Curated annotation (Swiss-Prot):
Family matches, as Gene3D superfamilies: N-terminal domain of the delta subunit of the F1F0-ATP synthase
Protein name: ATP synthase subunit delta
Gene: atpH
Protein family (similarity comment): Belongs to the ATPase delta chain family.
Function: F(1)F(0) ATP synthase produces ATP from ADP in the presence of a proton or sodium gradient. F-type ATPases consist of two structural domains, F(1) containing the extramembraneous catalytic core and F(0) containing the membrane proton channel, linked together by a central stalk and a peripheral stalk. During catalysis, ATP synthesis in the catalytic domain of F(1) is coupled via a rotary mechanism of the central stalk subunits to proton translocation. This protein is part of the stalk that links CF(0) to CF(1). It either transmits conformational changes from CF(0) to CF(1) or is implicated in proton conduction.
Matches recorded under InterPro entries: ATP_synth_OSCP/delta_N_sf, ATPase_OSCP/dsu
Taxonomic classification: Bacteria, Bacillati, Cyanobacteriota, Cyanophyceae, Synechococcales
Length: 180
């Protein structure tokens, strides 16, 4: 991934600089997340933008038709620039890197919490407070996932730290201690 980061980082930093100059940070972060979700949920779109067969002008036309009413002009121009520079194929990596740099600069930790069932807002709030203390950041961006195999409880990961408070893990530990 370091090689890809060496390509994506300058573009991500340039986008962040434009955003900061125009005081559009929160709006842009929201649009970037929506754009990533749209591309990740549309393999056809990702394939079209990544296609070496499709001409740059055709890609820019697709970008304009799909995104002109969904994103602000700065982001639209950025997408067209990536098409011109033959970098639109790594758009998701560039946008992911943009979000990483934004979080680093804003002291926001990204946490993934996997639970057996959907968490209530109260549970999310309690988990968020605990993770903020562990991560040592001011803010936290929480991504939740559901995995019924956990049986109960949750598994949270922030960076390289993992908190396994799942029932499946406790049962596994109990089984190991009984087998000794």
């Amino acid at each position: 991934m370091p090689l890809l980061n060496s390509v994506t980082t300058p573009y991500a930093e340039a986008l962040l600089q434009v955003v900061n100059e125009n005081s559009q940070t929160e709006e842009m972060v929201s649009e970037v997340k929506q754009l990533l979700e749209l591309i990740n949920n549309s393999p056809e779109l990702e394939k079209a933008l990544s296609s070496p067969i499709l001409e740059t002008d055709a890609k820019k036309k697709i970008i304009n038709e799909i995104f002109s009413k969904k994103v602000n002009s700065s982001l639209l121009n950025f997408l067209k620039l990536l098409a011109d520079r033959q970098r639109i194929g790594i758009l998701t990596s560039i946008l992911d890197r943009f979000l990483e740099i934004y979080r680093e600069n804003s002291n926001i930790a990204l946490a993934t919490v996997t639970s057996a069932v959907e968490l209530t807002d109260e549970q999310k709030g309690l988990i968020t407070k605990k993770i903020i203390n562990i991560a040592g950041t001011e803010k936290l961006e929480l991504v939740t996932k559901i995995d019924p195999s956990l049986i109960g409880g949750f598994v949270a990961s922030v960076g390289s730290k993992v908190i396994d408070a799942s029932l499946a893990s406790q049962i596994r530990k109990l089984g190991l201690s009984l087998s000794k």
